[in-house]
Swiss-Prot record:
The name this protein goes by in its record: V-type proton ATPase subunit E
Gene3D superfamilies according to UniProt: 6.10.250.1620, ATP synthase, E subunit, C-terminal (3.30.2320.30)
InterPro entries (alphabetical): ATPase_E_C, ATPase_V1_Esu
GO MF annotations in UniProt: proton-transporting ATPase activity, rotational mechanism
UniProt similarity note: Belongs to the V-ATPase E subunit family.
């Protein structure tokens, strides 16, 4: 049975409505999927940027902490250096005061004479040379000349060897030297300084840890002494 024009039109409208509905549903499905993908990508980008920002500020925070530690360490080191300088200056002042007192030693002729003989003989033990020249302060020349025989006797009594001692009459120790002598042997190739200053310096180096301990107390963090 043939369809009437009205039926055909009705079928066509029905098909068009179905096609339109299917197209709308497909479009909505595409839109939903696109929106979902957009939201996922947006979330990924947001998270990625958030991580970058967090990493940036974590790095900055670490840099700030490191800078603080460096500054703190530098300040601590500077403070320690200042303390050390003050202590060393104080030790140096103690030694300077000792040097001033050394200048008083030659005023006691008996004490100074015994000291000169001891200094000469000690140096002769180190040299063990047959002929030795003594360099002295010009002010001490006569005194040292009077002590040469005594020094030679003391040396021979202890080492069983003779030694010829003579004073350098052309070159003297500086007048501001506190006292003592220099001994020269082997045509000037060997020289021993036994001035009062050099002896004080030697003793100071040996006793420096004890001097520090006496002035400031023992350092509990220090395992070894100088």
């Amino acid at each position: 049975m043939a369809l009437s024009d009205a039926d055909v039109q009705k079928q066509i409208k029905h098909m068009m409505a179905f096609i339109e509905q299917e197209a709308n549903e497909k479009a909505e499905e595409i839109d939903a999927k696109a929106e979902e993908e957009f939201n996922i990508e947006k979330g990924r980008l947001v998270q990625q940027q958030r991580l970058k920002i967090m990493e940036y500020y974590e790095k900055k925070e670490k840099q700030v902490e490191l800078q603080k530690k460096i500054q703190s360490s530098n300040m601590l080191n500077q403070a320690r250096l200042k303390v050390l300088k003050v202590r060393e200056d104080h030790v140096r002042n103690v030694l300077d005061e000792a040097r001033k007192r050394l200048a008083e030693v030659p005023k006691d002729i008996k004490l100074y004479s015994d000291l000169l003989v001891t200094l000469i003989v000690q140096a002769l033990f180190q040299l063990v040379e047959p002929t030795v020249t003594l360099r002295v302060r010009q002010a001490d020349k006569a005194l040292v000349e009077s002590l040469l025989g005594r020094a030679q006797q003391d040396y021979k009594a202890k080492i069983k060897k003779d030694v010829v001692l003579k004073i350098d009459n052309e070159n003297f120790l500086p007048p501001d030297t506190c006292g003592g002598i220099e001994l020269i042997a082997a045509k000037g190739r060997i020289k021993i300084s036994n001035t009062l200053e050099s002896r004080l310096e030697l003793i100071a180096q040996q006793l420096l840890p004890e001097i520090r301990n006496a002035l400031f107390g023992r350092n509990p963090n220090r395992k070894f002494t100088d």
